[in-house]
Design a protein with these regions (language model features):
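Acidic, S/T/G-rich, low-cysteine, solvent-exposed domains in lumenal/extracellular/periplasmic regions
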Residues: 1-227
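Alpha-helix boundary/capping detector
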Residues: 97-99, 241-248, 257, 277
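Intrinsically disordered or highly flexible coil/loop and linker segments, enriched in small
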Residues: 224-231, 263
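Hydrophobic alpha-helical transmembrane segments of integral membrane proteins
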Residues: 256-257, 263
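Juxtamembrane interface at the cytosolic side of transmembrane helices
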Residues: 263-277
Length: 277
């Protein structure tokens, strides 16, 4: 995966400024609410008219994070305190109702995928909502969603799953793109995903799912790379996927193009930048 030309660096924005040559930040399942200073740096990062991107991944293990949630809502993204669960046994993977296939609703970030027929999965996902479709210079769109037979289960009901009864059905949003447009035609964006487990090593290396292909396409598209030959590590066959809901991130994210990744505090902020030619 190193062959996809991404390099990794780490920095703490809680104690230093975000480097100017960072293009993409990946923030995975923080468990502590960021302070206002960090959020101000993120806001400046996305407001400098330089086509910057924040990829945010939620997780069902996260507590309530009011400052972070308010920050995302300003961009039109709400992360709900529940879990997506599949009610149709034919769509369940590994006999786990929290693990099922995901539908691509919007192909804006899938241009360089090699095969969109291979299923994508967002296990142990939190549902997302669009707070608005457009608000001045910000617009939102749904990228991924669950099936029509999924439901959502509140956190407090998960311990009593056998006695739980679905009250509403999907599809539910699992990925939302929020884009801020500038006067010169440039944009900055936040892409929020409901599942950090979708980045697990088991899924990214599995030939049964297109997660690695999808995320590589997302980064290729956001960093305006064209004519890219993707090199993806695949494990073929029906091996068991050892998934859990811990904050899982592929610490090299090195399979995705050459962009430094920066780890911030609890839940990892990962920053990406293109290598200078």
């Amino acid at each position: 995966m190193e062959n996809n030309n991404f390099e990794v660096v780490s920095v703490s924005p809680a104690t230093e400024e975000i480097p100017e040559d960072i293009d993409v930040l990946i923030w995975v399942a923080p468990i502590n609410d960021p302070d206002q200073d960090v959020l101000d740096k993120l806001d400046a990062f996305l407001s400098d008219n330089e086509e910057k991107t924040l990829l945010y991944f939620a997780d069902t293990t996260q507590p309530v994070l009011p400052r972070l949630e308010a920050f995302l809502e300003k961009w039109g993204i709400a992360v709900e305190p529940s879990s997506v669960i599949e009610t149709d046994n034919r769509k369940i993977i590994n006999s786990n109702p929290y693990f099922s296939t995901t539908q691509i609703e919007n192909t804006e970030l899938t241009d360089t995928m090699t095969d969109i027929s291979i299923p994508l999965t967002m296990p142990f996902a939190r549902p997302l909502d669009t707070v608005f479709e457009t608000n001045m210079d910000i617009s939102t769109s749904v990228l991924l969603q669950s099936s029509e037979t999924t439901s959502v289960i509140p956190y407090e009901s998960e311990s009593d799953l056998e006695n739980w009864t679905p009250e509403e059905y999907g599809p539910f949003s699992l990925a939302i793109l929020s884009k801020k447009s500038f006067e010169d035609g440039k944009t900055s964006q936040i892409v929020a995903y409901g599942s950090s487990v979708s980045l697990s090593d088991s899924l990214l290396s599995s030939g049964s799912f297109s997660n690695a292909d999808y995320y590589l396409s997302v980064l290729n598209t956001l960093t305006h790379r064209e004519n890219v030959i993707a090199i993806q590590s695949k494990t073929l066959g029906g091996q068991e996927l050892g998934l859990n809901t811990a904050q899982v991130f592929l610490i090299g994210l090195s399979f995705m193009i050459a962009v430094p990744i920066i780890t911030l505090g609890f839940g990892m902020y990962l920053w990406l930048k293109r290598r200078n030619a």
